[in-house]
């Protein structure tokens, strides 16, 4: 089990919160809450040791060149594929946009 932390530049915090997925369904749960202005923080608890570079590349592809809202994202992973991670994150972003 590893705990990883990532940070990216961001804009203003959203008003909404979201919880998508669950560890038993697709092996991934994502919790999204408003963060501190200017910072997007991501904490990942994963059962896959040695995968930090994979996570870093996934987040870089999603957030480089954009200004996402300032969010605090917690991910609980039990071996999800990068495609499932991206899907769950996009579902969460859609949910916070509905507030």
From Swiss-Prot:
Subcellular location: Cytoplasm
Cellular component, GO annotation: cytoplasm
Record flagged with keyword DNA-binding: no
Keywords associated with the record: Cytoplasm, Phosphoprotein
InterPro entries the record matches: Mal_deCO2ase/Cit_lyase_ACP, Malonate_deCO2ase_dsu
A molecular-function term among this protein's GO annotations: acyl carrier activity
Sequence similarity: Belongs to the MdcC family.
Function: Subunit of malonate decarboxylase, it is an acyl carrier protein to which acetyl and malonyl thioester residues are bound via a 2'-(5''-phosphoribosyl)-3'-dephospho-CoA prosthetic group and turn over during the catalytic mechanism.
UniProt-recorded name of the protein: Malonate decarboxylase acyl carrier protein
Source organism of this protein record: Pseudomonas fluorescens (strain Pf0-1)
